[in-house]
């Protein structure tokens, strides 16, 4: 006769197993609003059967809970992290581009470029009627000052945006380092629990949430590989190697992580750049992180695009001649004098190596297009260095395919140089006279600093 206690044991196992499953469901419901929480499930299996002296040979002994694990898909995690970088890139760009756009608003509530320019030319047109009226002349001068004040104000505002982005780059790097530290600590806590046979659901959720955040900042790759017994490769210890790569470079290696640091540039790259723009390097090797490269993405890439974006219009050319103290460059990318964006002193990059220059001159053809630039170097070159540089490609800054602050400032500078130059040429023409009928030769109405 079957034991009644055996039947009670089977029933008890069922009650216990489904009580655990019910508690797991309650836990899922309770954490419905918990950020980063993954749904958990109780994994059930039949208990070991008992051998019996009967025709059927064995009898089931009930049910047992093998584990309670989070339900996550590695495939969807990977896809999500890959697309997070693109989301972070465009969200960050959108925020700053809207700020830039605000400086060019021209409507009933905010007077912008077109309105101010039209007002100045209307005043100029008024001068053609009572040309000797000093009040009319003064009104034109006032409107011209307003026109210049507008551009100075926009330039100041764009510079402030560049400063703001630069500081956000620094705070973002600090956040990346903090995330790396947290992930490395969580890796250790998770392995301590799981090497003893448990499963660290909540800690894994915390780690995945950190990866979610990190992947929106920089392109992120994650790898988790079981640690096996060195003497028995098929035997897993329960621990895992967990590595994280950002921008294709190892960032977290299980319990260790590498820090990034910001280093201020010693020279400006663009003529209108603010001082102290940051570059990102690895703290241990001082190698460049290249957050703004074309292959990168994420909110950090967006910050570099806004701060340094030049629409791929940086200075480039071929080295035609080299002396101990100068480098002459022909076939330049910038042939219009008014379109020059290079700082008076800065850095030439040739074959990945930097050469500081203290000054430059240029020559033009009959059409006033620049043919060659000659840069005066800060440090003299040896004869071997001169021979190696001849015929190489040179550039100032990087070619960044984005319309950021440097691009808009360069467009403004080029417009103002052309406008002021044309206006001053008229003022210096042979027919130009002042109020007293005197020639206005060598008189510049618009000047720049």
Spans of model-derived segments:
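Structural signature of extracellular appendage/secretion-system components
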Residues: 1-449
């Amino acid at each position: 006769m079957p034991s009644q206690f055996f039947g009670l044991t089977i029933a008890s196992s069922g009650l216990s197993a489904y009580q655990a499953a019910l508690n797991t469901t309650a836990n899922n419901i309770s954490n419905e609003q918990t950020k980063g929480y993954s749904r958990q499930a109780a994994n059930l299996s039949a208990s070991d059967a008992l051998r019996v002296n009967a025709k059927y040979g064995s009898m089931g002994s009930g049910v047992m809970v093998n584990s309670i694990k989070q339900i996550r898909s590695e495939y969807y995690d990977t896809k999500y992290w890959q697309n997070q970088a693109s989301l972070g890139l465009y969200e960050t760009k959108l925020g700053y581009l809207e700020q830039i756009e605000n400086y060019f608003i021209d409507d009933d509530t905010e007077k912008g470029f077109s309105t101010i320019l039209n007002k100045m030319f209307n005043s100029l047109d008024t001068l053609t009627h009572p040309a000797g009226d000093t009040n009319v002349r003064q009104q034109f001068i006032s409107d011209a000052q307003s026109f210049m004040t507008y551009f100075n104000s926009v330039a100041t505002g764009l510079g402030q945006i560049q400063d703001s982005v630069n500081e956000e780059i620094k705070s973002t790097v600090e956040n990346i380092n903090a995330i790396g530290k947290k992930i490395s600590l969580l890796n250790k806590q998770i392995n301590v629990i799981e090497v003893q046979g448990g499963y660290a659901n909540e800690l894994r959720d915390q780690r995945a949430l950190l990866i979610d955040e990190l992947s929106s900042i920089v392109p992120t790759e994650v790898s988790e590989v079981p640690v096996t017994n060195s003497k028995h490769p098929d035997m897993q210890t329960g621990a895992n190697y967990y590595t994280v790569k950002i921008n294709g470079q190892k960032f977290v290696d299980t319990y260790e992580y590498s820090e990034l640091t910001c280093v201020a540039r010693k020279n400006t790259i663009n003529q209108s750049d603010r001082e102290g723009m940051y570059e990102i390097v690895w703290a241990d090797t001082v190698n460049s992180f290249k957050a703004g490269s074309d292959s990168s993405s994420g909110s950090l890439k967006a910050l570099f695009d806004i701060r340094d974006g030049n629409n791929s219009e940086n200075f480039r050319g071929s080295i035609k001649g080299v002396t101990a103290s100068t480098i002459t460059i022909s076939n330049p990318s910038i042939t219009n004098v008014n379109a020059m964006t290079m700082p008076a002193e800065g850095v030439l990059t040739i074959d990945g190596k930097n050469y500081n220059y203290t000054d430059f001159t240029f020559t033009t053809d009959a059409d006033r297009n620049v043919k060659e630039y000659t840069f005066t170097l800060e440090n003299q070159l040896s004869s071997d260095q001169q021979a190696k540089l001849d015929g190489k490609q040179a550039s100032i800054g990087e070619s960044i395919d984005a319309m950021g602050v440097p691009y808009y400032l360069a467009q403004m500078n080029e417009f103002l140089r052309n406008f002021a130059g044309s206006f001053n040429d008229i003022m210096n023409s042979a027919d130009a006279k002042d109020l007293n009928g005197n020639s206005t030769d060598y008189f510049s109405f618009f000047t720049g600093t």
